[in-house]
Amino acid sequence: MVDYRQLRNGLVVTAFWKAKPQETEAVAGILRKFMPKAQNDPGVQAFLIHQSKDEPSEFFFYEVFEDEDAFEAHQKTPHFKEMIAGEALSKLAKRERFQYVVI
């Protein structure tokens, strides 16, 4: 169980991805390999990636970081640079990302 008091300085990031039609399986495969690596990054409280049941080319990310520094460090990891920046992003038709803080 998460101690929610630890999240007072936390950062929640949600993202919505839509893969190009011919790239859905490739994106899903990349994300399956990426998620366990991201879950083990320092400062990650939660990191889940979901694929739509109704529209398989759509993906939803729910990420909780202990602070902004942890989020920035996550984006600098070798697995983020290789798998997300280097492989997945070019296979997307759409990408949206939103950041939230605990109130």
Task: Please report, for each region that a protein language model flagged, where it lies by residue.
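Short flexible/disordered coil segments
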Residues: 15, 77-81, 103
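Short, well-ordered beta-strand segments in beta-rich or mixed alpha/beta enzyme
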Residues: 11-18, 48-75
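Non-catalytic surface loops within mature trypsin-like serine protease
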Residues: 19-21, 67, 101-103
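Short, contiguous, helix-prone interaction/anchoring segments in small proteins
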Residues: 15-42, 48-50
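An amphipathic, aromatic/His-enriched active-site/gating alpha helix that lines ligand/cofactor pockets
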Residues: 39-45, 64-98
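Residues at secondary-structure transition points
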Residues: 2, 6, 25, 74-78
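Glycine-rich beta-strand-turn "strand-cap" elements at beta-sheet edges
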Residues: 1-9, 49-57, 84-103
